[in-house]
């Protein structure tokens, strides 16, 4: 009888254990105890409970936080956090019950801000600079375990760089209303000698490490070479061709025709006019200017205009025009007194009482001609 009672108790215990094994614990997605959500983003948390008698109830609850939007049905509850703010961070608890038994699962919701806004100071390094600073703007959280900085060269941390510790300050922009307060964190390093050759750039890397999440942003810091090294090739290479090439052709090609061509026609052509040009001027350019045979063969004015025309077509037109205008002006000045003289002689010829000098000489000429015919020319009266 005792043996039968023992079997009965064992059967009942096995039945109870079987029912308990059929009841599964709560299933939460995502399963991590800490869930990170970006500031302004949205996230869903789903909680499920399977129960044999289909009488399970599941519900999300918040602890001193804004819970969010919750949709629940039999054995399932979904929590949605939209446009997450810093106030949405906190603890969420999923509570489920089945057959008189209660289960719960806790989730820590963490809201972070880590935009790609890194600035460096100075913007570019020169070998010998003592320090460099890197600042991450509008970030949270600022715990050193969550936010860290590193100074890299060639993908590895710069050896010998000494970190001086982060500086945390609130952003200068004042929050309005329910806006969240964000921070800027600055890390400074004391730089070692960069060595030779100098690397082209250093990199500031900021890393945000949260449970189930790791983000990194990187900002380049160019390294300029010493200012004295690039100057010699830059100054010597362009100056040598610039100074020698333009000066030699300018002085040799332009100066001789400028001094010889315009001066002689200005002095000789208007004064002698066409009378003395054939006797004097052809010899003077031949004797003084032995380099140009064209000047000795041509006339005084044309001989000096021809070489200028060959070298400078624009300069040839100006002396020729001056010579022509001077000649026309001289003819006009000579025509006016000639006309007045001719007019005066004409009036004297028409006047009977004042015959012209040519008419008064006629009797003497005729008398002299008569004496010559008789052979008495040259005999003085005695």
UniProtKB/Swiss-Prot annotation:
Gene: MADCAM1
Sequence segments annotated as region (Mucin-like): 226-317
Chain segments annotated as transmembrane: 318-338
Disulfide pairings: 47-94, 51-98, 134-204
Protein name: Mucosal addressin cell adhesion molecule 1
PTM notes: The Ser/Thr-rich mucin-like domain may provide possible sites for O-glycosylation.
Segments for region (Disordered): 223-314
Keywords (A to Z) from UniProt: Cell adhesion, Disulfide bond, Glycoprotein, Immunoglobulin domain, Membrane, Repeat, Signal, Transmembrane, Transmembrane helix
Positions bearing carbohydrate: 83
Known tissue expression: Highly expressed on high endothelial venules (HEV) and lamina propia venules found in the small intestine, and to a lesser extent in the colon and spleen. Very low levels of expression found in pancreas and brain. Not expressed in the thymus, prostate, ovaries, testis, heart, placenta, lung, liver, skeletal muscle, kidney or peripheral blood leukocytes.
Residue spans of the Sequence repeats: 228-231, 232-239, 240-247, 248-255, 256-263, 264-271
Membrane topology: Single-pass type I membrane protein
Keyword hit for DNA repair: no
Molecular function terms from GO: integrin binding involved in cell-matrix adhesion
Pfam family, one: Adhes-Ig_like
Domain of life: Eukaryota
Gene source species: Homo sapiens
